């Protein structure tokens, strides 16, 4: 989800446990936006704020989306542009604001997460996936690890990817652990 972008970037900026925070270099992070939701990148207040704060080195709009610092025809070109033109150490690729879903197993824009991971792998990157986890969504299919994450990562992704599973307490934590 586009709304996860600031949290993902905040996590990427945190030093590792064994690093001295004062000595840990901050990675150069670029945002690549797919065309699975709103097409104008300027609709994203998150990207604007992250760039203003210096947390993003730039943005790339891909496919039919537009309005990034750079624009690319495909996810693959967008990833390459972020790495080689913007000089990113880390690239976060999500759809833009807004979501499309049909309440069917395959009818949601988030299945495109698999395409992003596959593209990163094809380009010899290190695919890392972010889970959609919630206990606030009343829809059962989104309780714990959302069926969006489960479908995209276990059924549509054709490569290996790192996926961080949060360690949570209580009954909800047990649910997430069992789903992972």
Residue ranges, per PLM feature:
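Phosphate-binding glycine-rich loops and their immediate beta-loop-alpha structural context
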Residues: 1-72
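Weak global preference for isoleucine
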Residues: 8-9, 29, 90-91, 128, ...
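Short, hinge-like loop/turn segments at secondary-structure boundaries
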Residues: 48, 78, 145-148
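Glycine-rich anion/phosphate-binding loop at the beta-strand->alpha-helix junction
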Residues: 55-142
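C-terminal functional extensions of proteins
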Residues: 136-180
